[in-house]
Amino acid sequence: LSSQFGIDLSVRDAVDLDSVELPAPRIEPPAALAHRCSADRHERASHTQGKSYRDVVRASYGQLDDPPDLVARPRTEAEVVALLDWASDAGIAMVPYGGGSSVTGGVSCAVVGDFAGVVSMDLTGLDRVVEIDRTSRAARIQGGALGPVLEDQLRPHGLTLRHFPQSFEFSTLGGWLATRAGGHYASVYTHIDDLVESMRVVTPTGVSESRRLPGSGAGPSTDRLFLGSEGAFGVITEAWMRVQDRPVFKASAGVRFAAYDDAVDAVRAISQSALFPVNCRLLDPLEAAMSAGVDDGSALLVLGFESADHPVDAWIERAVELGRDHGGVVPDGIVKSGSATGNATSAPAGTAAGREGAVGAWRNSFVRAPYTRDALVRLSVIVETFETACTWDAFACLHANVIDAVTDAVNRVCGVGMVSCRFTHVYPDGPAPYFTVYAPGRPGSEVAQWDEIKAAASDALLANGGTITHHHSVGRDHDPWYRQQRSAPMGRALAAVKTELDPAGILNPGIIV
């Protein structure tokens, strides 16, 4: 990056938390809840905000101006009810908190409104897989279970939820549901919504629990009301989730394209072929170079298939054939595991398919990306992402205009920088483009610089037919553009729901409504 930017990048020391002054707590919990509440400075500091670029920058400077007064850690649903009753009666804002990985200000305690105080409700104490229905292949899981925690409990049963967002290690089932998180699957099961059988949600006015059903046409869906509500309507305490047998057969390939437009056409053909790959991520030449070590100017399509039931040879071979039909080449071949290899390369024993070559390099980079970003903050490098979805007919214009608008903003604000794009998920009717910005920041001004770039990006997304977010959620950061995207009647309807379920307005104030 130093070479690309033509400047020296020097490491800035992070501020020691012990030197940061936090305002004194304004509230005390009732005696019955005191054992679940803490005013410890490290607890309060770590629950002040999430993990967006601006959050990480502010934390590195010790700018924790709006910590919660208390952090509550309920261990039972009854304690969640008691906390909401207390908050409603005392006029205290209650911010539901899972793993704290929000990148849109969704767990920020800088709430707007006249509240006696703010409590961050950390739900990671509700972390059990309570029940497994092997016949229906479903599991009842508490909302505070972190990704690795729930998978560890499913694994002995030969099952998996198979939902792996980039925040997997530091995010919870309840957080995924509340933000409609995108996960492992690049097609079909792209969002956590698709894996929900039923949900149980505690609201300030009562408990809402939907019936366990494989499908229903009985009016508007209760689950759909709470999915994506981001803690504004209630606290998700548990859910029945559709789980799967652990995959045995896997195959992957990296298809390179000299022309990016040809790569896009290939992805569209694959997405409309009913092959339904679990991985179908297209990296533009810059992203391929930065994340996969592709140094010949090619775009890279990362393909993957998996199954617990049958070999996936025919599926990966047809997808690769479609790539070749559009000018793609496969220098590392097709890598398979758990199946007859045919003319493909077999993955070494004990390894998963797709962990070598450019595909393996991309995978490793994907896993490391959040940690790399946080380290770059100390170099005052602006490195952040934004994402969207659009129809195929709109993509070419959206891609060109967004790249132009963001590049102009980066050059204006930072003097120099880069913007890359990849597809994270694909649908028969359109892709989900995901953009990454790299630029040198001015120490002390990084947040203001990013805010200006982010505004230009968000304006361009909506102006060119995209959504303000495909899977990052609305939070506080996207709220102005979300209000433009949704209709006025829907805004009024959501406000009415908020009034009915949370009449005191204490749940995550300023979110969604």
Where on the chain are the PLM-derived regions?
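Flexible inter-domain linker/hinge segments
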Residues: 1-32, 83
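FAD-binding subdomain of flavoenzyme oxidoreductases
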Residues: 127-281, 346-348, 506
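Activity-critical C-terminal alpha-helical subdomain
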Residues: 475-513
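C-terminal substrate-recognition/cap domain of FAD-linked oxidoreductases
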Residues: 19, 25-61, 245, 251-259, ...
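Glycine-rich N-terminal segment of FAD-binding domains in flavoprotein oxidoreductases
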Residues: 27-28, 38-124, 161
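Glycine-rich tight-turn/loop motif centered on a GG-T
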Residues: 69-71, 113-118, 138, 381-389, ...
